[in-house]
């Protein structure tokens, strides 16, 4: 009986899960890899395009009115900030990227775990994880700026910056829409961008993303409480950043809460639906060859039994 090997039945082009062009033509495979990288960069650019347009153009926020007796917008303007934009970006981005670099290098060097079309495992790991993180940053900032210019909520220090001429305003009308600000126009436009807090959304996104990254990559069991301590510290940093905006008279408490919710939502969506941090690795296995059993008729079975009995 002929010994049939299942491996011979596999079409050569289907081995290694690819076509002959990908398996035997490295030039075409390399061009496809470059095309995919360019597509990823294009998607990253498009995700951050609303943020870039709003920040670099003269788009003005929605012109919202106010009530003369609204105490929530009568706070004085503070000259300094507890956490300015430079510190926020430096801490949020630098800490997250350094943690990702450390985690991926440890994972590849010590655990020998890396699967990617990019040949260098270190470059491949950083490309995937840092790319996903920056993609989420772009989405979060675009969401924030779109909300700011669309809603135009007045900051707590709006009247201090606007300095309207109340002698020309009839407060008995209730909601005042027709008014003119005598303050600096750039500061007035910035004072119309209260909802929602960009500091709260950005800090929550970066820190929660890092918390989830530690949950997926920090596998050392030596210190049971070390990982929860690090995660708690990161979340508290995000909370402090958002709450400082209330004490600085930059945002209302509801602005900060909305920013926290938006940053957390984007972080969870990026981690669970875009990145592969919590995705189980599945391998495609070919089915085992079927075992052919010899089928005998009842007469052949009787003859075979008689043959054994005679022996």
Swiss-Prot record:
Region Mediates interaction with CTNND1, residue ranges: 275-311
Transmembrane region(s): 34-54, 86-106, 123-143, 194-214, 226-243, 258-278
Catalytic machinery residues: 199, 251
Reactions catalysed, as given in the entry: a 1,2-diacyl-sn-glycero-3-phosphate + H2O = a 1,2-diacyl-sn-glycerol + phosphate; 1,2-dihexadecanoyl-sn-glycero-3-phosphate + H2O = 1,2-dihexadecanoyl-sn-glycerol + phosphate; 1,2-di-(9Z-octadecenoyl)-sn-glycero-3-phosphate + H2O = 1,2-di-(9Z-octadecenoyl)-sn-glycerol + phosphate; a monoacyl-sn-glycero-3-phosphate + H2O = a monoacylglycerol + phosphate
Tissue occurrence: Ubiquitously expressed. Highly expressed in heart and placenta.
SUPFAM superfamilies: Acid phosphatase/Vanadium-dependent haloperoxidase
Effect of mutating residue 106 to A: No effect on basolateral localization in polarized cells
GO process annotations (BP): Bergmann glial cell differentiation; blood vessel development; cell-cell adhesion; cell-cell adhesion mediated by integrin; ceramide metabolic process; gastrulation with mouth forming second; integrin-mediated signaling pathway; phospholipid dephosphorylation
Record bears the keyword Transmembrane helix: yes
Motif (Dityrosine basolateral targeting motif): 109-110
Motif range (Integrin-binding motif): 182-184
UniProt keyword annotations, A-Z: Cell membrane, Endoplasmic reticulum, Glycoprotein, Golgi apparatus, Hydrolase, Lipid metabolism, Membrane, Phosphoprotein, Transmembrane, Transmembrane helix
Its EC number(s): 3.1.3.-, 3.1.3.4
Record's signal peptide: none
Chain segments annotated as coiled-coil in the UniProt record: none
Sites marked Stabilizes the active site histidine for nucleophilic attack: 255
Region of interest (Phosphatase sequence motif II), residue spans: 196-199
Region Phosphatase sequence motif III: start-end pairs: 244-255
Name recorded for this polypeptide: Phospholipid phosphatase 3
Organism: Homo sapiens (Human)
């Amino acid at each position: 009986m002929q010994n049939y090997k299942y491996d011979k039945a596999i079409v050569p082009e289907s081995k290694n899960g690819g076509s002959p062009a990908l398996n035997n033509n490295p030039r075409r495979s390399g061009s496809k890899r470059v095309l995919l990288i360019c597509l990823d960069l294009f998607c990253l650019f498009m995700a951050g395009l609303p943020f870039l347009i709003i920040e670099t153009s003269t788009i003005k926020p929605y012109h919202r009115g106010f009530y003369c007796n609204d105490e929530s917008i009568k706070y004085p303007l503070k000259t300094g900030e507890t956490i300015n934009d430079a510190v926020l970006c430096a801490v949020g981005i630098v800490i997250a990227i350094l943690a990702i670099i450390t985690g991926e290098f440890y994972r590849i060097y010590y655990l020998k775990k890396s699967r990617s079309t990019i040949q260098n495992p270190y470059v491949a790991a950083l490309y995937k994880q840092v790319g996903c993180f920056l993609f989420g940053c772009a989405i979060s900032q675009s969401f924030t700026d779109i909300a700011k210019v669309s809603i135009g909520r007045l900051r707590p220090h709006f009247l201090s910056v606007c300095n309207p001429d109340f002698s020309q305003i009839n407060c008995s009308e209730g909601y005042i829409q027709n008014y003119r600000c005598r303050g600096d126009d750039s500061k007035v436009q910035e004072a119309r961008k209260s909802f929602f807090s960009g500091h709260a959304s950005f800090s929550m996104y970066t820190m929660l993303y890092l918390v989830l990254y530690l949950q997926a990559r920090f596998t050392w069991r030596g210190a049971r409480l070390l990982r929860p301590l690090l995660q708690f510290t990161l979340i508290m940093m995000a909370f402090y950043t958002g709450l400082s905006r209330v004490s600085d008279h930059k945002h209302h408490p509801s602005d900060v809460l909305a920013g926290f919710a938006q940053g957390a939502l984007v972080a969870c969506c990026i981690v669970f639906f875009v990145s592969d941090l919590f995705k189980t690795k599945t391998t495609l296995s070919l089915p085992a060859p079927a075992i052919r059993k010899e089928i005998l008729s009842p007469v052949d079975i009787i003859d075979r039994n008689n043959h054994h009995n005679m022996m």
